[in-house]
C-alpha cells in the first residue's frame, strides 16, 4: 500500500491532508504527528513542484487540492482597502520561486517529544 490510513475513511483522510497541506503552505511550519507529517510531505512536495511549473494547468491542479484560505492580509493606506493573499497565490508567488534551483526535498521533518495525552510521536514539518 502506498499510503497510510491514519485511522480514517478515505474522504476524511483526503480532507485532513488537504487541510494540513494548506496550513503548511500558509504557516511554513506546523506541529503534527509523525505519521501525518510523513504523509503530508508527499502532497506538499507535489504542490511545490506544480508551483514551480507555473502554467495554467499546474495552477488549476493545485487549486483543486489546496484550500481557498487567506494566507495574509495587508492594509493599504493609500486606497484605504485590505488586500489579501490566498494560500494558492502564496504558493505560486512566494514559495515556488524560492525553490527554483532545488529538485525536490522542499520539506524537513524534525521529531519532537511525544504528545502528553497519548504519547503519540510528534514531529515538526517545515519548509526548508
UniProtKB/Swiss-Prot annotation:
GO molecular function: structural constituent of ribosome
GO BP annotations listed: translation
Ribonucleoprotein among keywords: yes
SUPFAM superfamilies named in the record: Prokaryotic ribosomal protein L17 (SSF64263)
Keywords: Ribonucleoprotein, Ribosomal protein
InterPro entries attached to this UniProt entry: Ribosomal_bL17, Ribosomal_bL17_CS, Ribosomal_bL17_sf
Cellular component annotations (GO), alphabetically ordered: cytosolic large ribosomal subunit
Calcium as UniProt keyword: no
UniProt cross-references to Pfam families, sorted A to Z: Ribosomal_L17 (PF01196)
HAMAP family registered for this protein in UniProt: Ribosomal_bL17
Subunit structure: Part of the 50S ribosomal subunit. Contacts protein L32.
Family recorded in the similarity comment: Belongs to the bacterial ribosomal protein bL17 family.
Name this polypeptide is given: Large ribosomal subunit protein bL17
